[in-house]
Every structure is written in C-alpha cells, then in structure tokens.
Amino acid sequence: MCPSPDKASIAPPTDKPEKNAWAQPDLDDFSILRRGIPDELPPANLGRRDPTVPHAPVRTPNLTPEGETLALRNALRYFDAKHHATLAAEFAAELRTDGHVHMYRFRPTYELKAYPFAKFRAVCRCDEAACILLMVMNNLDRRVAQYPQELITYGGNGSVLSNWAQFLVLAKYLCEMTTDQTLSMYSGHPMGLYPSSRHAPRMVVTNGMVVPNYSSKADYARMYAQGVSIYGQMTAGSYCYIGPQGIVHGTTITVLNAGRKYLGVDDLAGRVYVSSGLGGMSGAQPKAAVITGAVGVIAEVDEAALRKRHAQGWVDEVCDGGADACVARVRAARAARRPLSIGFLGNVVDLWEAFAAAPGELLVDLGSDQTSLHNPLGGGYAPAGLTFDAGRALMVADPPAFKAAVEASLRRHVAAVNALAARGMRFWDYGNSFLLEASRAGADVLPAGTAPRAAGSAAPTVFRYPTYVQDIMGDIFSLGFGPYRWVCASGDAGDLAKTDAIAAAVLREVAAAARAEGADRVADQCADNLKWIEEAGGHGLVVGSAARILYADCEGRALIAKRMNDAVRDGVLAAPVVISRDHHDVSGTDSPFRETSNVTDGSAFCADMAVQNCIGDAARGATWVALHNGGGCGWGEVTNGGFGHVLDGSDESGAKAASMLHWDVTNGVSRRAWARNDNARFAAARAMKAEPKLKLTVPHDADDAVLAAALAG
C-alpha cells in the first residue's frame, strides 16, 4: 500500500551488493583475467539463472533450421573441437529456451564490478587497458546492469557483449595490450589486437553496423541470435555507462526547463511529474523529480526493478495498492509541496486512466514516458490488461496476439494522455519512440487535421506532442552543452569530491567570462550546472564506479579535462580519470525522433555527423571510440557514437583530450549551425573567434518571398 506522508518508506542510498546465497565473492586473484577461455570446461551451467537478479525476456528470433545450425556453429568457434559435442547440446538448449546463446557455463564466479584501478593495473600492461577493463566490468556489475547474466546493461536489450566467451577473450586481450596495439571489437566479438602506435586509439568498437537495407527489427533478431551482431544501445556497448546517474542530470535539466517553458516557474514545489520506467535509464526519473523539488510518480510493472531502485534510494516510496490509491497519495503530496518520488507498482496505462478520471483539480502538470518502446515487441513495453508475467508468456507463446495487445494498450495510453493534455497537462516524448510506435499502432498522436499516414510512407517526425529535444534539449545541444562525464579510476569517494570541486571552479570561470562577454545564454547554462555539481555529492548518485556527470560546452569540457589531468600528474588524485560522455549529445547521435529532431533542413535522417564524429575522435587520439546502430529510439532508427579517454597525468593525454574534445563538440555545433539553428550559429561564431584555425561554412538565409516567387506557377 502507499504509506502515509508521515510514514514514508525512504531507504538510504547504498552502493553495497546484496547479501544472499547467490552473492559471488570479490575477485581476489586478478591474474585469472589473463587466462581467457579455459582449456578445460567449467562445471555445466555454472551460475545459471540466479533468481536474485532480473533476467532478459525470452527472445523469439524465428530462426530457420539452417539459421539454428549457423548460430551453433558460430558459438562453437570460440572453443577447442574436443569440447564441441558437450557444448553443442548445451548451447542448443540455450538457443531454444532463451532465444540466444549466452554461454552461462563460462560466466565468471567472481563479482564483476569497477574494482580500484591498481587491481587492474597489476595485471595489465598499460594504464589505458586497465581503465577499459574497469569500465567493462562496471557495465556488468549486478547493481548496475539491468540483466547482468545476459550481459544487458540497460534498455531491455542494450548489450555489452553477446556471450560470456567474448568477455573472457576481451579481458585476456586487455591484459596483454601494449601502447602500440589497437583492439578491434566487432559487435561484441574481440577480433584481435593489431599493431598500431601510441597515437592511435587503444580500442575501436562497432556495434550493429549493417548494410543499411538490412536494418529491420527482424534482421536484428536473427543476427543477434546467430551471434554476429548486438544492439549496444549507447553507453552499454561503448563501456561508458555510469548507472542511472548517467541520465539523472539530463532528466533534471529537462524537467527543470519544462517547468520554466510550460509552467513559467523555476520552483516545481507542489507540481507533479508522471512517467513510467525504472530501468537503467528511466530509473533516473524519480531522483530527478526530487532534485527539482517536484512530486515524481513513476510506474513500473517489473517489481524487481522497482524494489531495486527503492533499495538504492532512487525511489522514496513504493505504492503497490492500485492506481486509485496512488492518485490519492499524489493529491496529498501535491498539497504538502514537498519533494517526493513515488514508485507505482503497476501498468502506467492504468495510472494515466486513473488520473484522467480523478475528479476535481488537474493533478498532473508534466508527463512523459520512458518505457523501452525502441523494442516494443521484445519486452520493452508491457501491455495493459495483462500482468507482467502473463505479458511475457504471451510474447513467447503467441507473438501476433502480443503485438495486438501492445497496440491496443498504446491506443489506451495515448487516449488517457490526450484527456489530461486537454485539461492543461504538458506532455513530451522522451526519445524512446513512444510517439512513433503509438502512431504505428493507430493511436491519436498526429497533429489535428493531419491525414492518416499511407501504408509504406515515411514515418512522421511531427506529432501533436513534441520530443523533449524539439522543445527543450535541442537548443541546449545547439549551444554546445551536453552530458560530459568522468570516472575516478581509484574508486575513491575523496577523489570524486576533488573532481567535483575542479569542475565547479571551471564552471564559475566559464560563466564569469561568458557574462562579461554578454553571452548570457552560456552563463545561464553554466549556472544551472554549477548548482548541480555543488549539490551532486549530497544526492547519493553513485551506483557502481565513482562517476559524475554534468552538462558543459567545448570550453568547459576542455578546461575540466586539463585541470583533472594536472591533478593526476601532481598526485592530487590517486589514479587516472576516464572522461567520456553520453552518446546523446551535441555531436554524437543522428536520430530524427530524438537528438536531431530539431534539425529542420531535411538532414534529420542523415548520419554524417555521428560517423564523422567517431572518425574525428579517433584521429585526434581518444583512448577508445565506438559507433553504433540504434540507441534510444531503436535499431535502424539511430546512428550514434561515443568515446572514452584516459587522463593519466601525461602531457600527451592532456594534448589528445584538448584536441579531441574541441572536435567532439564543434562538429555538432557546426552541423546544427548549417541547419540554421540560432543557438548553434551563436556558438559557432564564438568558437571561430576563440580558435583562429577553425573555419566554418556559414549559411545565408533565403527570403521566403524570394522562394515563393521562384516557385510560383
């Protein structure tokens, strides 16, 4: 039941693994990482189906007999032929039971997590490899990953790797890597270590890269089952995930600016934000709502996910007494005007319908959705009218019936949202393909007066509700601000506090200079992020690695990196710092339904920016780079990329960071400026003034009257 306001069940944040019979010991002998795939087989089905962690839904790839044979043949190539008879039968059972060969037998018996840098450095031959291994293991931490045993970090199918043999090979290569080698990762498969140079990346990652005509969801299901491709989401497959903190800041900025734009307020006390999802990304929503001062109500059908976020302190209260009880609790919380997050155990459609039917005042001010609708038929969306378990069972037993249930649920979902929006609630698409999939389901999401979409026509990019990029984040990206993050490889909370102080000092400097220049829009962004970083240590954000995130522009990112590199050099920090960013950024992602949805020159569907960004980061010395198909809105809908860079205190790592970060931001600013975005044009002009070597092609605006006259008749 929902607790009363004075008896709220608020759990303190914790970063400790759960104690249970399935808990694995910490890794003691790190030399095991050097061994790779063992010559002798571990015990059969070692550690399979740990009941204390969530598991990925069963996949239904619909392989032909020839396809099944190929999947097994591909899986067995990691192993000596003497083991094939034993493993073939076992892998066939996994394929037919789970829809994928995870190779559970080879799952490590030790706890996977971001151990202190010194532990990895003792078995690795270079700092860069040790940091990469730390980041990979953080993505597979049971506290961090959504489905750790299936190597899924977030988003329902955001894979780190395809199977456990790949993890063993990857760890071995990273232990062996030197500073004149580069590791190539092909959709989870470690293709090998290649001679390169100290100036080249230590690792190049590609995930889901396919010939464009073969990028349907059915293509993905087949290729994933056959072990030849993975959906890396964004930071799952690039090994840069930092737990729900990775998105909580962006969510905070979004909700804060939604209040300013839609409600005309800076203070969200007594305001209510309703959404869904408590997974790896969506789990940031309740924490973000509290940070902004609002009441956040987040629905989640998977009880394990809800209880996990509650235990970690990311949800204040659990409401498991039904939708009407939740509405009553929200009414009281709204009146109390105190920050509060409520995790509703149930389907968000039922919750939306209860709010729509509630008498009296409008209870919901702001609304969105973060179900994994990039994968609606593979477990990313739970249809209303079915329990969580019943929905998963139907998905496997009768896919057409499940599809019909999802589409009917989406129509109900949208109808309830529309009813509340008609009364004044403001709703936006959170870049999870909600409006796209709702339109495909026949829901009423197109603008008034829009003709129904013809079969086979291009998907719409304009709906009755905006994406959060179109209305809020797009202009922030265009200004050059985006999610910059870092990980203190020492794992020391003291090091993290020192880096927070470094970042805060930089933001003050950048803000003051921008204000003096008259660039108030830059200074205002710095002010929001300064408040965030000054308070971040008190919000219990760390889950997994000692990481932090904030939004900064080109100048801010480069200066923060320089100061942190200096701190490593001077011994102020005990170990290197890994800098990175979300792929959801200024330059990293081409996605017409999210990151580039506010690009209006017709190039929203073009992927040059993301591809150029990855190549450019590699050319300028990033420690590793990644390029992915999919991420956020789904396979075939997005091209995105990211990087990781190790600041080891050397002049070389500092110079590489300065060059790479300048490109990593100005690339996207340039593209957005060429598309005639005002903030981007402003940022591009400032960038050229600051760096004389930067020469950008500037657009000239055409007069509407000239265009009309030219096309008349």
Where are these regions (language model features)?
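Catalytic or ion-translocation cores adjacent to nucleophile or general acid/base/metal-coordination motifs
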Residues: 233-239, 243-253, 260, 267-272, ...
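Core active-site phosphate/anionic-ligand binding loop and the adjoining beta-turn-alpha structural block
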Residues: 324-560
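C-terminal domain-closing interface element
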Residues: 332-338, 344-357, 680-712
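Short, solvent-exposed amphipathic alpha-helical segments in soluble enzyme
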Residues: 290-292, 357-362, 443-447, 568-569, ...
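N-terminal ligand-binding/catalytic initiation module
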Residues: 2-250, 256, 260, 264-266, ...
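Short, charged/polar "capping" segments at the starts of alpha-helices
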Residues: 305-308, 437, 587
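General beta-strand structural signal in soluble alpha/beta enzymes
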Residues: 182-187, 205, 275, 298-299, ...
